[in-house]
Amino acid sequence: MLRRLGVRHFRRTPLLFVGGDGSIFERYTEIDNSNERRINALKGCGMFEDEWIATEKVHGANFGIYSIEGEKMIRYAKRSGIMPPNEHFFGYHILIPELQRYVTSIREMLCEKQKKKLHVVLINGELFGGKYDHPSVPKTRKTVMVAGKPRTISAVQTDSFPQYSPDLHFYAFDIKYKETEGGDYTTLVYDEAIELFQRVPGLLYARAVIRGPMSKVAAFDVERFVTTIPPLVGMGNYPLTGNWAEGLVVKHSRLGMAGFDPKGPTVLKFKCTAFQEISTDRAQGPRVDEMRNVRRDSINRAGVQLPDLESIVQDPIQLEASKLLLNHVCENRLKNVLSKIGTEPFEKEEMTPDQLATLLAKDALKDFLKDTEPSIVNIPVLIRKDLTRYVIFESRRLVCSQWKDILKRQSPDFSE
């Protein structure tokens, strides 16, 4: 397959490297992995039933964008420190025009919100992408000029999954600022940061996959969580089998709020077992699911959880149509489906809850597709698959909640 060569040019601009004294650089704190012990600690300190917000953990490289008052040059940082402008880091220079626009917009909105000038505004996020092994997606080889030399843009992660895009992208998840040069950084509460992120055209940011008490969040099955990112970066029509997400980052909803005095951890990683950094023995035996017991108890308490629909479908028109589709799964439709089936499959014990739910889901999809606009029918393949999964999920939930009554009513001896 032919490789396309794209080159972007950037001038080398003198800039004093700052960060060694720590006055500008803010190291992103390592996040603890979730396990039964840490979850029990949350229960013990009364934080378990607080509101928590889970976002997809993107598999990439930590990346910070710094806007400093009085300086035209934006600075960029990896996990270990602010980089000099000529450092090659996966080819991030190709994104500089977009990154500058993002942080400039955030600075303007944040200063207006705070009604004051701010010394530093920092967007924390993840640099990711560079690999997408789909037969219909061309392999590309791009370079970018750094310090007068062409440098190859490389994949940030090379694992078989998750894969996001053949191109490089930035995924924002935090906003911090400091008012004065000698001051400390303040972190915006998640909802405040999202309010700003969503006002910046083209910015990819960490949307809530699920939120609520920890009992609800922990019921989310990270082992079967397919990454939500590809449709957001143009790969929605190119599904990959087994493209599992790395996991979730789960934050306390009040993290960053003035006066919030937590008695336990406020940020945890819920990782898919394949990404957990622990094994059963020192010889690197099979990895273990440290959240298995917690997840089982949470499912018993809150039920199985799917990602919030808004994290999957982000186009407003498509989102409204998706909600309408789920409204097609209702008791009246279930009664109509049962009337078409009759009592014989129930008398012979040939009908199971899953089979009935599948019939209900198919009926809902059929009626929805008859009346919906062509633009909705032709949404990306990955989103269509997700919506089908939601319809089946809602159908199963409705059928299971009424199964005993259904068996009673479908008996030939039943009378009102």
Curated annotation (Swiss-Prot):
Pfam families: RNA_ligase, T4_Rnl2_C. It comes from Trypanosoma brucei brucei. InterPro entries: RNA_lig_RNL2 (IPR012647), RNA_ligase_dom_REL/Rnl2 (IPR021122), Rnl1/2_C_sf (IPR041948), Rnl2_C (IPR040609). It is found in: Mitochondrion. This is RNA-editing ligase 2, mitochondrial. Its main location: mitochondrion. Transmembrane segments: none annotated. GO terms for biological process: mRNA modification. Component of the RNA editing complex, a 1600 kDa complex composed of at least 20 proteins. RNA editing in kinetoplastid mitochondria inserts and deletes uridylates at multiple sites in pre-mRNAs as directed by guide RNAs. Its EC number is 6.5.1.3. The gene is REL2. Belongs to the RNA ligase 2 family. It is an enzyme of class 6 (ligase). One of its GO terms (molecular function) is RNA binding. Residues 1-17 form a transit peptide. The active site is at K57. ATP binds at residues 29-31, 56-62, 79, 126, 173, 269-271. It catalyses: ATP + (ribonucleotide)n-3'-hydroxyl + 5'-phospho-(ribonucleotide)m = (ribonucleotide)n+m + AMP + diphosphate. SUPFAM superfamilies: DNA ligase/mRNA capping enzyme, catalytic domain (SSF56091). One of its GO terms (cellular component) is kinetoplast.
